[in-house]
């Protein structure tokens, strides 16, 4: 039996990549598309909806969400309430929102995933960085994205910092008396480590994690040159969440 999929935000670049991936996989069936701004009523025989409420009662298994931080929480909550397993690539959730959604998924006995990054290489980078942080306490993160990205720092950078902070003693980096001649020059402060965000046209999604110690340095980097790099992870997530009974944060929990 094929897995029936809804894509929210299908007109965006990630949504278009997800549309292509789902329609090319014989194990998946696209049953609904959501975008509040389109005038289209259907695409290749698949119905298009302008409001999530119009999807209530639709027979579907998985809700794929590539929308905006402004609506992602409400969308994910709606999906769970309707019995859809959410696979969410939109970032910007607060810790409180994540906890609420995880609790709701347990009540509904539905699997789900919220992931800051679906590229397998990026997931590995986060894991490798957490391993290195046990031995290199001084670290800074540089994330680079296209200039249309709405949030900063990226969800991937925040997730990386969270994983590092779990194994690294809290430490304020840099000189104790350092001063910024321009506010923000040292980047965002996360538990003493610094996160820097770059936004430029031509970029897709890139991240460096730079460690420093006496007499040596270690740099880890991942690059997504095309949004197709995320689709292996999205495909894996769609097929895995239907087997689960709880929402998780981070693709690594499904690998």
Swiss-Prot record:
Catalysis performed (reactions): (S)-2,3,4,5-tetrahydrodipicolinate + NAD(+) + H2O = (2S,4S)-4-hydroxy-2,3,4,5-tetrahydrodipicolinate + NADH + H(+); (S)-2,3,4,5-tetrahydrodipicolinate + NADP(+) + H2O = (2S,4S)-4-hydroxy-2,3,4,5-tetrahydrodipicolinate + NADPH + H(+)
UniProt KW keywords: Amino-acid biosynthesis, Cytoplasm, Diaminopimelate biosynthesis, Lysine biosynthesis, NAD, NADP, Oxidoreductase
Residues bound to NAD(+): 9-14, 89-91, 115-118
GO biological process: diaminopimelate biosynthetic process; lysine biosynthetic process via diaminopimelate
Domain of life of the source: Bacteria
MF terms (GO), sorted A to Z: 4-hydroxy-tetrahydrodipicolinate reductase; NAD binding; NADP binding; oxidoreductase activity, acting on CH or CH2 groups, NAD or NADP as acceptor
The EC number(s) this enzyme carries: 1.17.1.8
Annotated active site: 145 (proton donor/acceptor), 149 (proton donor)
Binding site for (S)-2,3,4,5-tetrahydrodipicolinate: 146, 155-156
Enzymatic class: oxidoreductase
Pathway it works in: Amino-acid biosynthesis; L-lysine biosynthesis via DAP pathway; (S)-tetrahydrodipicolinate from L-aspartate: step 4/4
Pfam families xrefs: DapB_C, DapB_N
Subcellular location: Cytoplasm
GO cellular component: cytosol
PANTHER family tied to this protein: 4-HYDROXY-TETRAHYDRODIPICOLINATE REDUCTASE 1, CHLOROPLASTIC-RELATED (PTHR20836:SF0), DIHYDRODIPICOLINATE REDUCTASE (PTHR20836)
Known function: Catalyzes the conversion of 4-hydroxy-tetrahydrodipicolinate (HTPA) to tetrahydrodipicolinate.
Family, as annotated: Belongs to the DapB family.
The name this protein goes by in its record: 4-hydroxy-tetrahydrodipicolinate reductase
The organism of origin for this protein: Streptococcus sanguinis (strain SK36)
């Amino acid at each position: 039996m094929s897995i029936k999929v809804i894509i929210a935000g299908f007109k965006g670049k990630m949504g278009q990549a997800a549309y292509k991936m789902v329609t090319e996989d014989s194990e998946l069936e696209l049953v609904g598309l959501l975008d509040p701004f389109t005038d289209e009523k259907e695409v290749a025989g698949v119905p298009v909806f302008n409001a999530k409420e119009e999807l209530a009662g639709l027979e579907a298994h998985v809700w794929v969400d590539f929308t905006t931080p402004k609506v992602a929480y409400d969308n994910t909550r709606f999906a769970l309430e309707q019995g859809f397993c959410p696979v969410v690539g939109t970032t910007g959730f607060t810790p409180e929102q994540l906890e609420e959604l995880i609790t709701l998924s347990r009540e509904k006995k539905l699997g789900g995933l919220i992931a800051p990054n679906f590229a397998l290489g990026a997931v590995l980078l986060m894991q490798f960085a957490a391993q290195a942080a046990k031995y290199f306490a001084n670290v800074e993160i540089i994330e680079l994205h296209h200039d249309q990205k709405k949030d900063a720092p990226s969800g991937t950078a925040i997730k990386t910092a969270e994983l590092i902070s779990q194994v690294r003693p809290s430490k304020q980096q840099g000189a104790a008396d350092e001063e910024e001649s321009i506010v923000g020059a040292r980047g965002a402060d996360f538990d003493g480590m610094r996160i820097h965000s770059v936004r430029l046209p031509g970029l897709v999604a890139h991240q460096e994690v730079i460690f420093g110690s006496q007499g040596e340095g270690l740099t880890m980097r991942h690059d997504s040159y095309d949004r197709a790099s995320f689709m292996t992870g999205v495909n894996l997530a769609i097929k895995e969440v239907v087997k689960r009974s709880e929402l998780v944060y981070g693709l690594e929990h499904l690998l």
